[in-house]
C-alpha cells in the first residue's frame, strides 16, 4: 500500500470524535497541570497542540462579526511553528475592508511553580501585504519556551456578509477540541462546502429575533459544529492541495457563475477596463493592423512585455487601471493582462479574459460559485 493511502486511512481510523467530559476552556484560565504537560496524550511526537479553539460568525444584517479564541500548548518551541500567528483580512477595490479589533494575547510559563504571563505588545505586530486585496496581520508572541501556553482572542468586523472565512478543525498539529458557530438571518442563503475525509456533524436551530425586518419575519438560523481530538494533518508528497483533505467547513453567499461573470464584466476594476480607449496606443494599433494576425498578436505581446513592469502583486482586479498603467508603466497582474487584452481587441484579435485560481489554492470547484473562489 502506498504512502498516500496509508497516511489517509490511518487518519480516517483515528479520527474518532472522543468526547470530553470536562468544562470548555475560557480565556485566562490556564492551569499548572496544563503548563507541566510535556507530551500530547495521543501524539507523543507533536511539537504543539491546540488545546481548544472557538469561532463564532454572526451575520448582523449585512455585516459580519467573527469572534476567535485559541489556546495552544507548545511542546517544542524551536520546531512547533506556532509561536506566532496571522490573521488574513480582505479589502475590496471600492475600499471596503475587514478589520481586526479587541486583540488580546498572552504567553503563559511557570516560574518558581507559579504561573507567569507575558502580554503581546504593539511592537510585536506586523503587516504583510500579500496582494491589493489581501493583507495578513502577523503577531509574534513573547517569551515562548518549551512548555508554554499561548492564548489569544480577537474579533473581525467585515462588510462582506456573503464571504464567511473558512473554519479549520484540523491543522499540522493535533486539535483537542474545536467549536464553531454560524448565525445568520433566515433570508440569507449560503452555500456550504465541507473539506476532509470524514463527514462533519452539525446541529441546526432557529429562533425569533424580535420585530420583523423588511425582508420578512426576523428569524435567526444557527449552525453549530463540535469536534474532539482531530489528529494532525500529514502532508503527502506530490499531493496537489493538502487543504482539500483538511477537515474544515466554508459558507458563502449563494450565487451562480453567470452572476459572477456579470459582476466581473460590469466592474470598473475589471470588465470596464477592457473598454478604455487607450489613446496613446492609437497610432501603434493602426500600424499593427496591417500585419497578419499571428504577427499582429506577437507585436502587441512584445510591446506590452517591453513597456511594462509587474509589481509582483496578484489579484483579479486592477490596482492602477490601464490608463494609469500606460503612464506609470508599472502595475499588478490584472493591470497588465487587461491592458494586453484591450490592445488585442482593438487590433481586431478577439480576446477574452479567463479567471481561475492559482495552482497553490487547488482546483476550482465548479459547484461552489463565488468571487472568493477566483
Language-model-derived ranges and their functions:
Residues 8, 56, 136, 166, ...:
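Residues at structural and domain junctions
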Residues 235-319:
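Acidic low-complexity segments
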Residues 8, 66, 99-101, 176, ...:
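Alpha-helical structural motif
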Residues 1-26:
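Bacterial Sec-dependent N-terminal signal peptides
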Residues 15, 75-78, 307:
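Polar helix-capping/helix-linker motif
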Residues 22-268, 272, 338, 345, ...:
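Beta-strand-rich, non-transmembrane domain signature
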Amino acid at each position: 500500500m502506498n504512502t498516500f493511502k496509508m497516511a489517509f486511512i490511518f487518519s480516517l481510523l483515528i479520527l474518532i470524535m472522543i468526547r470530553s467530559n470536562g468544562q470548555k476552556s475560557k480565556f485566562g484560565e490556564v492551569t499548572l497541570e496544563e503548563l507541566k504537560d510535556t507530551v500530547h496524550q495521543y501524539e507523543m511526537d507533536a511539537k504543539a497542540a491546540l488545546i481548544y479553539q472557538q469561532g463564532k460568525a454572526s451575520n448582523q444584517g449585512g455585516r459580519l462579526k467573527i469572534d476567535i479564541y485559541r489556546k495552544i500548548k507548545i511542546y517544542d518551541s524551536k520546531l512547533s511553528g506556532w509561536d506566532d500567528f496571522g490573521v488574513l483580512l480582505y479589502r475590496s477595490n471600492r475600499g471596503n475592508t475587514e478589520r481586526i479589533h479587541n486583540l488580546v494575547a498572552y504567553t503563559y510559563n511557570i516560574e518558581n511553580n507559579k504561573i507567569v504571563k507575558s502580554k503581546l505588545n504593539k511592537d510585536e505586530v506586523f503587516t504583510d501585504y500579500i496582494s491589493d486585496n489581501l493583507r495578513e496581520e502577523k503577531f509574534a508572541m513573547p517569551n515562548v519556551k518549551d512548555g508554554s501556553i499561548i492564548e489569544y482572542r480577537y474579533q473581525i468586523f467585515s462588510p462582506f456578509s456573503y464571504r464567511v472565512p473558512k473554519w479549520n478543525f484540523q491543522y499540522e498539529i493535533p486539535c483537542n477540541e474545536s467549536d464553531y458557530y454560524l448565525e445568520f438571518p433566515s433570508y440569507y442563503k449560503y452555500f456550504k462546502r465541507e473539506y476532509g475525509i470524514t463527514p462533519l456533524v452539525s446541529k441546526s436551530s432557529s429562533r425569533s429575533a424580535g420585530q420583523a425586518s423588511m425582508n420578512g419575519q426576523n428569524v435567526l438560523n444557527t449552525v453549530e459544529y463540535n469536534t474532539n481530538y482531530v489528529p494532525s494533518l500529514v502532508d503527502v508528497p506530490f499531493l496537489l492541495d493538502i487543504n482539500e483533505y483538511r477537515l474544515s467547513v466554508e459558507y458563502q453567499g449563494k450565487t451562480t457563475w453567470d452572476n459572477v461573470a456579470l459582476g466581473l464584466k460590469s466592474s470598473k476594476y475589471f470588465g470596464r477596463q477592457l473598454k478604455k480607449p487607450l489613446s496613446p496606443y492609437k497610432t501603434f494599433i493602426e500600424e499593427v493592423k496591417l500585419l497578419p494576425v499571428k504577427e499582429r498578436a506577437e507585436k502587441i505581446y512584445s510591446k506590452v512585455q517591453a513597456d511594462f513592469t509587474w509589481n509582483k502583486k496578484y489579484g483579479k482586479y486592477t490596482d492602477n487601471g490601464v490608463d494609469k498603467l500606460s503612464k506609470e508603466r508599472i502595475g499588478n497582474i490584472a493591470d497588465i493582462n487587461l491592458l494586453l487584452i484591450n490592445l488585442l481587441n482593438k487590433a481586431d484579435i478577439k480576446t477574452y479574459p479567463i479567471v481561475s485560481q492559482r495552482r497553490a489554492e487547488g482546483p476550482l470547484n465548479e459547484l461552489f460559485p463565488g468571487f472568493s473562489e477566483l
